[in-house]
């Protein structure tokens, strides 16, 4: 069986100018090509689309994943190809992969099998340089903070209260907590510092929530980097850093156009993680896609409790976007995992474990319908070892909830294998069941910050309560009193469970969500609440994917999957 990269390397790609012209009607002068198979759309062209009507927005999310993931990106690509196959002009709209998980656990994030976006190697490795630009903008601000302190500290920044961290697009646990400026007076004032992964940075969040280059600059200026000795906030604007940061990001802000294996257009732009950030591609990319196609298929990271909740409560709240339908991705093996089966035994039929694990998908479906107010289709990513008895058990259970459960084979068959899912989505959207009318947020923005996270925890996670130490509660109160109480909350927690305990599988209830840390993201306009043991700078696994990635004698990349 061919690997993902082997399938991608054998594909016949069309020049991106041809894809843009034939599929989307975009003339060459609106494209900025990066080689033959990827290009950026000019911001002038993006602005020219604003008066066009919007297409239909389909959100792809998933059950709580296993470490291997459940195939959201693969489903998003396969569904996009399937919709095109049945005559619906469709654009796939995805996040860009981070090098951290590419070299860490996942080994690639451009879909899989015969449902991929290509050129796969380029997309997974550097792509058009957007993440590097975001990293540089973030670290320029960090350098200007320490430089300002070194040259007299006119703003009276308290070095003990600097909240801005440096970032790197790599999993590197050794950089989580460091001491910088060692080596003598010429190197600045020594202080504690640390690195986050670039996809958790506020610059990434701002990049993905900005609606224009002007909005980007304004938001960058609003970043709070720390506090003075009088405990007044210090911003990037105070340091006169936001203009140069905007210059570094001006080309990155242009959406990236590539294609699927079936030569259908796809826009990839931005890439915050959903467990430690808000988990959605850029607003500019999504809004542009909706002007160019009748259907737009996008994804939100990890499970419907994380990426989808943030898509609803942060991205939609800020942008005015409204999904028309949700596709919930699941696998039989993941449901058995949630039923208590060891990873090594997931390929063996186990109806008892599946019965228990179905509680996980039931809660996600209930959340989507009851708390997000959206219609839902369940797409089962098919594996050859799924048995008819297992599929029947799942379909029978979900039939009680009147939720369509459709087996999809896009990994093996491309768009053809997802046509049934595509037809189910079209039926929802075009027969008056579209979710835009019933759409709702999990909480009202006027609620206090603690009430917001309590609403997420009790409604979405099934928790009994939220706990905050006196120190954390005090920090939340300060943010509330300082005028940030109307901001939405971005919860950072494990993706593997509804709780903050990654080993609590299924649908745990009655647990407590412990808030460990609170961070103000004034430029992104949300409050990050870090819960449990989740880290904003991941580490590599014992056997990282980097060990298998290489360059063959023929000059081709091997080991990406």
Swiss-Prot record:
Keywords, sorted A to Z: ATP-binding, Ligase, Nucleotide-binding, One-carbon metabolism
Coiled-coil region list: none
Catalytic activity, EC: 6.3.4.3
GO molecular function, one term: ATP binding
Origin: domain of life: Bacteria
Reactions performed catalytically: (6S)-5,6,7,8-tetrahydrofolate + formate + ATP = (6R)-10-formyltetrahydrofolate + ADP + phosphate
Pfam families found in the cross-reference section: FTHFS (PF01268)
Binding site for ATP: 66-73
Classification via InterPro entries: Formate_THF_ligase (IPR000559), Formate_THF_ligase_CS (IPR020628), P-loop_NTPase (IPR027417)
Metabolic or biological pathway, per its Swiss-Prot or TrEMBL entry: One-carbon metabolism; tetrahydrofolate interconversion
SUPFAM superfamilies: P-loop containing nucleoside triphosphate hydrolases
PROSITE patterns: FTHFS_1 (PS00721), FTHFS_2 (PS00722)
Protein name: Formate--tetrahydrofolate ligase
CDD domains linked: FTHFS
Record field: transmembrane: none
HAMAP family (alphabetical): FTHFS
